[in-house]
């Protein structure tokens, strides 16, 4: 279906009305171009899918929402906007869509967050009531759930009052209370512990209320993992053919798909025996007390016992084999080269895939039967068995998927990375089996590209090394299939607004002298901090080890640093804003996750410090397997794997500085390999064009000296061209 004149007119009218709603709105050519490109794709005018890189400042969210809503209304489809993190998801839901509602009459939208973001009203009721007053409530719960203290009970009672009075929608991110993870893990629930329609609280449950709203919404804001799960299970979202799909932060999609397909499970023989015995007893209880309408042959005691015994014997054999492969020690790991399993292990995996799938099917059958008996049995006893069977189903689902994936030699034309680990838990050794495909393009083709007619993939960073090649290889999007790849210009003048500083340090950030390099970095940072020229600063590290070593060199500054892990990220950012707005200096210190989604403009962030070029870890089983596979194809892993990933990370880190026309400042990168290695120029060429300075290191760094304040050295003049350095 081609874009109609009415749709074009509607898009233009809404865009014009938007300019009147936003103070100091600046019309931008890249934004108009993006609106046009998105409209052509979603309207079916041009190509299959669109990958469009929209640099910071383009206004990409409104650029896809306006044409997306116009086309969705005309074609009576649902616009699904998917993001990679909760912060952006909530921004679109709480800020961008309410803004558009002012110019788009009767706009209906909702958000679909993961189950774990919502409070479970059943758990909340238990935790908000003191144990003496709970009465029969706990009888509905399989696990004892009582408040740990009077203070905790009062906090939960306040949450319950807000939920009951509709002041709170049950979403963790929408309460003004700071709820620590330990409490939230008890307030929320997961699929295995949810009674679904059989729960007394089902009708008012925030999670299910939100799911029901999806059916009436024109726009649904979700996340990548939820979208993939929904398309795979054909639930939650409308049929793919009735969707318009926008994948914001689309560079995360291959990783999210890989994470969703990664399977790990405890395969320790004692643990397996425990799970099988519990399931056998549960099946016997169902047969005796709840009389299923149909009795599966596998549920007879003798057959089920023999079936479970075969599972146990195979797992025990697997334990013996991998036990010989694992290095000695409490914590150890063994990776199967190229993901190739010994023949005996492969045969065990294939057999276990069939056996555990049979157990999964049996659990599902009993669960469905139990769900239909709520009116004819003791509700307390039934609910307990329902919960136990639901958990058994989750266990065997995971086992079945694990052994099925382990049985595959290849997925998406590449090996499946497989490894085993030994861990000690509560003093007992446990063996875990892990599988993950190193390519997921076939799965994405099957779930998304082939099912949804038109998809827009967008992000401020889709390319690495000025190329879409890595995205194409990892996602399966390709020119030959009619997919288009577009790059928009940045609306900012980076050369005038900022500069890139690469200090002349003695050491490169290599492992053999990491500590010496970090000592130099700390001294340079200290000198910059003491100058007081920048109120808002950000320091980014490639690893937690490096971050902690750096902090050990600046103990006197530690109280003034807001370090990742000290508090939740949103709280650290709030404190940072408050300090800078009060005229104080503030420094955020974090890892790569702080290089994404951090939008601090003007004085809030005017100096970014980057520890080093962040190459991916070389000891990850997935990375090592991918490297082996690339070498077998006569491809150079550094070129295909490491360098594109490093370029991508660096672009994101550098992108924290210039967020608006009023932003200014400098980016300090403590890695001279950008200037001394052949690949350095390629990494620099993929960045926005900045003036480049190479200041001398402070004197205290060049030769040992008595302890004193490090003095700032002379700075060189800015480079006038990209490849000219001072």
Where are the predicted features?
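Conserved interdomain hinge at the start of the Helicase C-terminal
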Residues: 446, 503-542
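Signature of the SF2 helicase/ATPase Hel1-core->accessory helical subdomain module
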Residues: 64, 70, 90, 94-98, ...
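Conserved RecA-like ASCE P-loop NTPase motor core of nucleic-acid helicases/translocases
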Residues: 78-87, 456-460, 535-542, 669-670
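Conserved RecA-like P-loop NTPase helicase motor core
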Residues: 503-513, 566-675
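Walker A/P-loop
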Residues: 44-66
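Conserved helicase motor "Helicase C" RecA-like lobe of SF1/SF2 P-loop NTPases
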Residues: 542-566
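A substrate-engagement module of RecA-like helicase motors
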Residues: 2-20, 26, 75-78, 83-218, ...
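A contiguous, basic/glycine-rich beta-loop/short-helix subdomain that forms a polymer-engagement track
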Residues: 185-218, 228-237, 366-506, 512, ...
